[in-house]
Amino acid sequence: MSEIMISKEAMQYIHMAGNLLKIDILDCIVSNDRLVFIVRKGQLGIAIGSKGKNLEKLRNLFKKNIKFVESDSDTKRFIHNLCKPYSVKDISVDGEGSGAVVKIQVDPSDKSKLIGRGGSNIEIIRQLAQRHHSVKDVQIK
């Protein structure tokens, strides 16, 4: 697992969201139109809030789409969490240590959505997998 370097902008988002929702936010990826927060295991329900009210609060505050992902010490479960809400059929980890390659098999109807426009979704998944686990690359099958 590599050392996590968080930008000043991401730190501000983490601080504001964490204080507002009273949860532990471990990481944040800032994209053009969205924020992806990694929350401590067991705090996903609190982060989203009843009927998604906390998501809506943050959307209004930051004027960006918000996604929460639950952290997990198991690489496969963490990758599965990153891929939600898409239908993941299988996740395999080839290799060990910092050279591990994760291969995700998804339902064909979800493949393009998981990759995202211009590869934006898969790039975020790669970044977070590398930051939180010893993963070299993430591939979609």
Enumerate the predicted regions with their spans.
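RNA-contacting regions in translation and RNA-metabolism proteins
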Residues: M1-K141
